[in-house]
Amino acid sequence: MNQPYSAMRNNIHMLGDFLGETIREAQGNEILELIESIRVLSRDSRAGDEKAREQLLDKLANISTENVLPVARAFSQFLNLTNIAEQYQTISRHHQDESLGNRSLSALFARLKAQGTPVETVIKTVEKLSIELVLTAHPTEVTRRSLVHKHVEINKCLGQLEHDDLTEAEQTKLKRRLMQLIALAWHTNEIRAARPTPVDEAKWGMAIIENSLWKAVPDFCRELNFQLEKHFDVQYEVALSPVRFSSWMGGDRDGNPFVTAEITQKVLRMNRWKAAELFLNDVSDLVEELSIVQCTPEFREKYGDHIEPYRVVVKGLRSKLQKTLTYFGELIEAKPTTVDPSEIITCDNDLWEPLYDCYQSLHACGMRIIANGSLLDCLRRIRCFGLGLSRLDIRQESSRHETAIAEITRYIGLGDYAQWTEDDKQAFLVRELSSRRPLVPTNWTPSPETQEILDTCKVVAQQPEGTISAYVISMAREASDVLAVHLLLKEAGCNYTLPVAPLFETLDDLDHSEKVMTDLFNIGWYRGVINNYQMVMIGYSDSAKDAGMLAASWAQYRAQEALVNLAEKYHIELVLFHGRGGTVGRGGAPAHAALLSQPPRSLKSGLRVTEQGEMIRFKLGLPAVAVETLNLYASAILEANLLPPPEPKQKWRDIMDKGAAISCEIYRGVVRGEPDFVPYFRSATPEQELGKLPLGSRPSKRNPNGGVESLRAIPWIFAWMQNRLMLPAWLGAGAALRQMIEQGEESTLKEMCNEWPFFSTRIGMLEMVFSKADLWLAEHYDQRLVAKELHRLGKTLRAQLSADIQTVLTLAHDGQLMADLPWIAESIALRNVYTDPLNLLQVELLQRLRSQGEVRDPQLEQALMITITGIAAGMRNTG
């Protein structure tokens, strides 16, 4: 193995030793020996030793109730430490150049230069670069914030230990600190006592910005500037902002009754308070720093004749920011405000303009090196975060808006809007949108549900333009769904046009999306207000749950392609908003590969994508890791726009059309058509028990009594990942490919693998899933937990998985899974030794708990929750 990976293994080994010492001290030798014996048996079992496997099963079947908790915690915490070591590896000083390889900005710019791409073309494309990451608190971030903080500190220690010039005393001190942190993590409860509230989730998002992104964004801009200067001898313009952040935390009310208008208002104020605090820190540093005397005559004329002109300007800003902080602090705590609102900073430009004037004056006076220090970082942050910290999306389901408008039309004697035809709805909405008189009578008292919708629209209307980034309509099916939101916002007094983004998320809705947008673009009123800008959101998780991975991904591709062509026809700037998750069943794929597999021209207006739950922590949780993530996103977007992927050949499309139809039929045949499927799913996975895990603020079901279709996409995937069958990520895909091969299409499929990024990414994602799936463990869940009469279904599914693995191997490079990403294969193999005991222990705990009926042993329940979070850490994907 090469040197960087041996360094990573050494780190994992060291962290594991420290964890062992912690356990010995806390629990005693006997427990440590039990844990070690389980680890050795698991390792031997993985290597094919049948006797070791039997001994492992026997040991875990007979484990005492008091021992289940420390054993589950030991393996779970070890997997967390492995994740930390792996995350550190990507930013290690010894590994930096290899980490991004040919996917980095540097490699892309070198390639563009070698190919003779005109500098003007590169600059123009870079100037339009737009990466908007939308942070969402999906109920998959299973690690508590108090543990995350300790994990960040462990990462810092690993970085300090890498320095070659440490004295023995310094090394000992750092190792002792590592042991302290691991001991602190061991003595901290992994599982929250209660579900987080939407406000807790918003605070978690703010903590990511404060602790990581605040530093990462200016660092990334410096990296971008450095690479532009190095390869093309140009500077990146200060006023440009390649990165923006938005959030769903406190704005996403789809299926979450706890996110109310009041909560949204509170989160918006908390964001402003936190932004004021962070900018106050920046500006206070500038007060210390900018003691310079010399400035331009223009600067002196604008800001007065002072000995230290810059200091006077930044002191004025400091005073205003202090008042802004106090003002929003009082609003959040519902105290009477002691600050005059005219004395606070409310718009970004009030902060930007004086600081940019300082920047230009310093430049003009030959002090470029000073201008390009912390002042430049502060300017970059104003452009990226602004005084709202992160913009907020509002999301609500289309039927809620329809119900609200129907209530209004019934009250004013126009009949029931919900019963009208689509044409009648559109005619009514356009008429009302074009009218100056209000629709809602002032003396009317709506139902509480409708009042909540109207109150939310009022909160949106009260915000300065730009604070709310979009109003997303989930389950959007028709043009009237979009017009309805525009009407509700108009009624609330919103005097600017907010981007209203329909979210197309089922197979039928994706196929219908072009028609919906055509209807909208043909409405004169609509074209007049959108200012040639349209955002459309593509749903990945629900479409995959509806139709299976292959059919969903092809429908997403076709919908994006059709929407890009439509927008070009109408000369409208289209931003596609991708609702991806971290898992394959929810559209997840390595960022760079996923972006290059998009249809040509679909990234012309930049990228807007959700970053969800645990992926936020893996990709953005540390400043250096966040810089890498932004580097990958930037290079992929620029590459997609400057070196676009090929248009798929007609024969490739025909194969995808056929394959998608076959795979959808197979997937739905099992998930919808198999009468025993739901009882099998409920018994073979910890789906019922997952509902007890205090993960997110949102209920896991849309309808508590429904079947699979009422289950949210996230717990659906989380449950299958636990028993290692990983069903949603592959069902239907491999079988469809097998049928194509049997029909003589093998050489075309291999051509698609080699020449079409969309298809090769799909095969790569299947390889990843198959590397993590485990037939023996999935069978073990069935044997112990599933009624005999349902065993046939599990047997059929495992046979299908086994056949699918062989099919993908036929198409994969070198005939082995993950051959082109050996370090991921290595990582999965390393984790399996620690994840397997958690799976086996989970089966044991599920069986014991289910046999106890209603009154369950709290110790066993706690241990079960830890196996769930541990397996999630081991798989590096939750939902």
From Swiss-Prot:
Leader sequence residues: none
GO molecular function annotation: magnesium ion binding; phosphoenolpyruvate carboxylase activity
EC number of this enzyme: 4.1.1.31
Cofactor(s) needed for function: Mg(2+)
InterPro entries attached to this UniProt entry: PEP_COase (IPR021135), PEP_COase_bac/pln-type (IPR022805), PEP_COase_Lys_AS (IPR018129), PEPCASE_His_AS (IPR033129), Pyrv/PenolPyrv_kinase-like_dom (IPR015813)
Keyword Nucleus appears in the UniProt entry: no
Catalytic activity: oxaloacetate + phosphate = phosphoenolpyruvate + hydrogencarbonate
Keywords: Carbon dioxide fixation, Lyase, Magnesium
A family per Pfam: PEPcase
Active site: H138, K545
Domain of life from the UniProt record: Bacteria
Gene Ontology biological process: carbon fixation; oxaloacetate metabolic process; tricarboxylic acid cycle
Any one GO cellular component localisation term in the record: cytosol
Keyword Lipoprotein part of the UniProt annotation: no
Function: Forms oxaloacetate, a four-carbon dicarboxylic acid source for the tricarboxylic acid cycle.
Protein family membership: Belongs to the PEPCase type 1 family.
Stated name of the protein: Phosphoenolpyruvate carboxylase
Organism, as annotated: Actinobacillus pleuropneumoniae serotype 5b (strain L20)
Gene expressing this chain: ppc
